[in-house]
């Protein structure tokens, strides 16, 4: 039986601090919002309010750059 945090084998993306240790492997399809995803290989999704585009190099709320007048979530 695969480790519960091994997203590649379980096809379940776990985006919380509970998956920070051994056996945690997320594939490219694993997308999490916020900076709480401790799983290696997990892609963090940057969301801006309204119809704003997110800047490049976003790894979480602290590095999310949105268009002027837009808030980052």
Curated annotation (Swiss-Prot):
Inducers of expression: By cadmium.
Binding site for Cd(2+) 4: 46, 58, 64, 72
Binding residue positions for Cd(2+) 1: 15, 19, 32, 37
Positions that bind Cd(2+) 3: 26, 30, 32, 42
Keyword Methyltransferase: no
Residues holding Cd(2+) 6: 54, 66, 70, 72
UniProt: Cd(2+) 5 binding residues: 48, 52, 54, 58
UniProt GO MF annotations: metal ion binding
Protein name: Metallothionein 10-Ia
Source species of the chain: Mytilus edulis (Blue mussel)
Organism lineage: Eukaryota, Metazoa, Spiralia, Lophotrochozoa, Mollusca
């Amino acid at each position: 039986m695969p480790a519960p945090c091994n997203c590649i084998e379980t096809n379940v993306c776990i985006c919380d601090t509970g998956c920070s240790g051994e056996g945690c492997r997320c594939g490219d399809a694993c997308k999490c919002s916020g900076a709480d995803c401790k799983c290696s290989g997990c892609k963090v999704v940057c969301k801006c309010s309204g119809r704003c585009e997110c800047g490049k190099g976003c790894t979480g709320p602290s590095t999310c750059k949105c268009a002027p007048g837009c808030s980052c979530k």
